[in-house]
Amino acid sequence: AEVFPERNSYDPKNPGWAWMSNNSIAAEVGTNYEDYVDLIADNGEPGFIWLDVARKYGRLADAPDNKDYRVMGFNPCAEQPLESYELCTLVEVHLNRHDDREDFLRTLKFAYLYGKTVTLMPTHWQITNGIMQRNRRIGTSLTGIASFADTKGMPALRDWMDSGYNKIRGYDKKYSEWLCVRESIRVTTVKPSGSVSLLSGATPGVHWGPGGAFYLRAIRFGNTDPMLYLLKTAGYKVEADLVSANTSVVYFPVASEHLRSEKDVSLFEKIGLAATAQKYWSDNGVSVTLSFDKETEKKHVAPALHLYEGELKAVSFLPMGNQTFPQQPYSNITREEYNSYVGKIGKIDWSAIYDGVENLESLGEAYCSTDACEIKFY
């Protein structure tokens, strides 16, 4: 509460229960969204999930198939409708890393095969195994969608999405028979993809970039992560996390090449792009957080929800303003600050993770039969 006093719903007596903790309402088409606008404008919550749409439809471009009538909820980021005890199987393709559509379609083959292969692995829970074997649900995701639309146009985006989806469905029919397993109930998704998209310079998932030609991206690492040791040694700015005692925050300098930032795009265009992805690409869901100017766009929140409630399976919001927060994910910097920071960063010897660094150990979880596992890199 001392670190984030603006969290007006924080209750010291019940620290685990408050807004700002990824809350959503199970809504239905026709919900009175006006009742929630003030809460959304305050801190972005609640979000909305439409189970009726998720159970009835795959892609919104296709006729209702009712295949997902057993769906009981979503994963935390709401890109995957799931049955109780069902797991996510996600893989991602970066739109901005392809020369043409044929190159993109070829990438989808290998992404699909990876996702399908993971569904062949058993888990420790028999009830989960039964559901996974019946559904074979995978989520082949796209990232860089907003920047692709800005550079190549919406007609090209719709074409790539639609042809890509049909190509994956063709692969699934072919390889499911070859593997002697069921075809997947759903095969595509759009996950939020915040940190992963930085690796290829893509805009994250279906979102526009955070804004600014130059900015710092704050990413959290566990204090026992060997990466943290290497980043400190290389000269990256590292701070102790203000909330978690066992976590550190590393600031990465980024030079953006995106044509527009999220501040340049209206609420309606943002939700419209998410609906396009739900219509032409994703037969699971689309993870989207709609940033909006709470001074000028608050009045548009409820109309936008009424307009697109039958075209999305889930949505959340993030009010934007002039207020800044400690260790926020993105913070703008000047060109001079960027160049100064980059000039101080040394080269990282990534092989040190495997070849051995003095006192360098990593503790983490592994896929094993015990409650906790220790992983050491030599």
What are the residue ranges of the model-derived segments?
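Short, well-ordered loop/turn elements at secondary-structure boundaries
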Residues: 13-14, 20, 30-36, 41-45, ...
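Contiguous, well-ordered alpha-helical segments that form the cores/surfaces of helical PPI scaffolds
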Residues: 90-92, 139-151, 192-199
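Inter-helical turn/loop segments and adjacent helix faces that build the functional surface
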Residues: 97-102, 123-128, 149-160
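Active-site-adjacent structural elements in folded domains
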Residues: 123-135, 182-183
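Local cysteine-cluster metal-coordination motifs and their immediate loop/turn environment
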Residues: 369-376
